[in-house]
Amino acid sequence: MGFEHLRTELEEMKQAGTFRELVALESAQHNRVTVDGKELIQLSSNNYLGLAAHPRLAKRAADAALEFGAGTGSVRTIAGTLEMHQAFERELATFKHTEAALVFQSGFATNLGVLSALLGPEDVVISDALNHASIIDGIRLTKAKRRIYNHVDLADLEAALQETQDARTRLVVTDGVFSMDGNIAPLPEIVELAEKYDALVMVDDAHASGVLGKSGRGTVNHFGLDGRVALQVGTLSKAIGVLGGYVACEQHVKDYLIHKGRPFLFSTSHPPAVVEANREALRVMEEETELFDRLWENTEFFKHGLRELGFNIGTSTTPITPVIVGDEALCHQLSDRLRQHGVFAQGIAFPTVAKGKARVRTIVTAEHTREDLEQALEAFKQVGQELELI
């Protein structure tokens, strides 16, 4: 009927070995999952703390659905705000040590809504070269001038700040934890430079919320920078285990986004089950602190094992550990063979990462046992030798 040129591109992907099928899980998201009837060790989810199937969250979601229904039937600004939506935002602001918080339908929608609403033609956005795709797309939607600085290059960032001093507002945007490499942004130095040149900072804590800081408060709290970062955005779907995105900010910024943030304005609000599960997740993170201990113990054990085997895992200092292969087809071979050995670890290639930087990105969680990780390392050893990667 149309778009026939897409068939050619898809066929080229198949010939290059980079075409991927969606993989359907047949079980809940745990340390082990079922795919095609086979139990696999899960190393590809963002379920850092194991909250996605935590019984407390599941029960709270079920109870909320029974009491308040399956959906809300409206956007927040018309008839879709329940008291629980407002209560959760108050709790989230308290958790993040900010004046206010606003919840969006997803982390991606948060970045689109925040950046497109807050920046105009008189402003400049200064963004790290390896920021998440949602930041890139959010910047594209603004009318602001833009400057991309080299990845975590403070000298290049300072040059960008020096070159843009005539702007009304300058916003420095960085991931807190970079999702493909697992490295942490040098946030103290970024904040110092921003303050030196009278600029603001926005941190995307998608992979830091629930991982860094006290009880998972994120990168800002991790570095003791509470009160010095204008915008903290993040997801509620990774370590927090449910769905949604948020911005933690000052009250007047929240008020403005309620009126001008298009993804917020034109999307139906979260169902009661989602809201209440998110609220319960914050309580679990405050109360079950042993989850963080297990997460970091597992992280160090697995990283050490991969290094000992001789894999290139980059400079990650977080639970994200990339096994960098380079060649896209070889990366997917590694992923496929790992599955044959009982490990679910997906290959990631262009356009998610740059060409020639393909990798199998692994993420350990608080749910993994030592047996899980030892078995996974043995699989990496066998497959790595088969493919002559080690």
From Swiss-Prot:
Cofactor(s), by name: pyridoxal 5'-phosphate
PROSITE patterns: AA_TRANSFER_CLASS_2 (PS00599)
Organism superkingdom: Bacteria
InterPro entries listed in its UniProt record: Aminotrans_II_pyridoxalP_BS, Aminotransferase_I/II_large, AON_synthase_class-II, AONS_Archaea/Firmicutes, AONS_Archaea/Proteobacteria, PyrdxlP-dep_Trfase, PyrdxlP-dep_Trfase_major, PyrdxlP-dep_Trfase_small
GO MF term (any one): 8-amino-7-oxononanoate synthase activity
Binding site for pyridoxal 5'-phosphate: G107, F108, S179, D204, D205, A206, H207, T235, L236, S237, K238
UniProt EC number: 2.3.1.47
Positions of substrate binding: R20, H132, T352
Residues annotated with N6-(pyridoxal phosphate)lysine modification: K238
Keywords of the record: Acyltransferase, Biotin biosynthesis, Pyridoxal phosphate, Transferase
UniProt-listed GO biological process terms: biotin biosynthetic process
Pfam families tied to this protein: Aminotran_1_2
Catalyzed reactions: 6-carboxyhexanoyl-[ACP] + L-alanine + H(+) = (8S)-8-amino-7-oxononanoate + holo-[ACP] + CO2
Pathway listed: Cofactor biosynthesis; biotin biosynthesis
Keyword Oxidoreductase: no
Stated family: Belongs to the class-II pyridoxal-phosphate-dependent aminotransferase family. BioF subfamily.
UniProt subunit comment: Homodimer.
Stated role: Catalyzes the decarboxylative condensation of pimeloyl-[acyl-carrier protein] and L-alanine to produce 8-amino-7-oxononanoate (AON), [acyl-carrier protein], and carbon dioxide.
The protein, known as: 8-amino-7-oxononanoate synthase
Species: Exiguobacterium sibiricum (strain DSM 17290 / CCUG 55495 / CIP 109462 / JCM 13490 / 255-15)
Taxonomic placement: Bacteria, Bacillati, Bacillota, Bacilli, Bacillales
